[in-house]
């Protein structure tokens, strides 16, 4: 190494411009970064549009067009099917939806499912992710992440069959508590009992994705923050609430949004042998299940299903606004509490008292 350095020094003395040419050649050999090649260069408008065309086509065909067709079918009715000239404006679809007793049960179950499952999934996944992220050895983190991710890739039919057996009248759940309750075969459309299997299955299946994303986010938090907090004598619980949670706020917001969408769109058909009539007659109706079942009910079915879909859209927006606002308020209060706590500590510290005394 010393020989190379001395040789390079002699060459530089003999050829003063050697360093300049070497640096220039090295710069020319470097590959251009993505930011420099795409962002900083003028690109014709049609090039990015060509790349976006497949996505735009799929989005238009399967989302935008069906959305407007759904609005059309919800407010119109063809007196003679196949003859557009007989189409008239009507609100009968919404009338049939609101008069249906199963629609109220569907709204009740969907909202209760979302309100219970989302907080449990978020709380449990954050706790487990925190334990995995603090694991000392990297191979242990990988093993635990793989174990907790297995429910996400497990076949939903196999999972549903397992839950059907688990919650049957003579299943394992009843055996553990020495009871005989028909959780999935109540015979009552207003029953609350099917909610328990639905909620437990929802929590179990929702943990996998949340744990994977939360663990990845926690591992990306700057470790120097934890070291500084440990030096100041801050415990692990306070570090979690005042360092970890604020640092993964964007990830938490994403998971809450996905949880809200999944909660309002719960579809427990597999728990009832893929028979929507069985699910509805046993009190397990949800908004998605109600819409699915109404599309197969004869004349005017599409109109009623379209009206129910619009109701689902409106309920989803209101539900999302309330839940996101609630979680946002909790995070804001927690952050403000932490800031006030630190500021009060600083104000009451000996250093601050000495500074104030000198200032006077």
PLM region spans:
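Short, Lys/Arg-rich, polar N-terminal cytosolic tail immediately upstream
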Residues: 1-42
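A structural signal for multi-pass alpha-helical bundles of membrane permease subunits
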Residues: 44-355
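Short, charged juxtamembrane terminal tails flanking transmembrane helices
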Residues: 357-360
């Amino acid at each position: 190494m010393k020989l190379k350095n001395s040789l390079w020094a002699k060459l530089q003395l003999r050829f003063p411009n050697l360093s300049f040419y070497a640096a220039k050649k090295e710069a020319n050999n470097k590959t251009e970064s993505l930011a420099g090649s795409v962002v900083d260069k003028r690109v014709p408008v049609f090039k990015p549009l060509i790349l976006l065309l497949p996505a735009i086509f799929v989005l238009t065909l399967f989302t935008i067009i069906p959305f407007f067709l759904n609005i059309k079918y919800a407010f119109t009715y063809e007196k003679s099917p196949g003859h557009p000239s007989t189409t008239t404006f009507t609100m009968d679809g919404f009338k049939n939806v609101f008069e249906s007793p199963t629609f109220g049960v569907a709204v009740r179950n969907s909202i209760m499912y979302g309100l219970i499952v989302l907080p449990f999934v978020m709380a449990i996944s954050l706790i487990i992710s925190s334990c995995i992220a603090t694991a000392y050895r990297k191979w242990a983190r990988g093993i635990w992440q793989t174990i907790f991710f297995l429910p996400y890739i497990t076949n939903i039919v196999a999972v549903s069959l397992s839950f059907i057996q688990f919650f049957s009248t003579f299943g394992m759940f009843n055996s553990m508590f020495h009871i005989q309750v028909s959780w999935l075969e109540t015979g009552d459309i207003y029953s609350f009992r099917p909610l328990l299997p639905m909620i437990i299955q929802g929590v179990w299946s929702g943990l996998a994705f949340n744990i994977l994303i939360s663990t990845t986010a926690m591992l990306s938090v700057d470790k120097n923050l934890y070291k500084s907090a440990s030096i100041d004598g801050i415990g692990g619980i306070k570090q979690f609430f005042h360092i970890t949670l604020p640092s993964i706020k964007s990830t938490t917001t994403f998971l809450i949004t996905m949880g809200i969408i999944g909660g309002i769109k719960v579809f427990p058909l597999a728990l009832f042998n893929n028979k929507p009539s069985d699910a509805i007659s046993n009190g397990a109706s949800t908004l998605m299940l109600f819409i699915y079942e109404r599309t197969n009910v004869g004349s005017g079915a599409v109109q009623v299903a379209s009206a129910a879909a619009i109701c689902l859209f409106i309920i989803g927006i209101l539900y999302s606004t309330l839940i996101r606002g609630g979680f946002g308020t909790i995070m804001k209060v927690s952050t403000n509490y932490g800031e006030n706590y630190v500021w009060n500590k600083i104000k009451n510290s000996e250093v601050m008292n000495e500074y104030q005394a000198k200032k006077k």
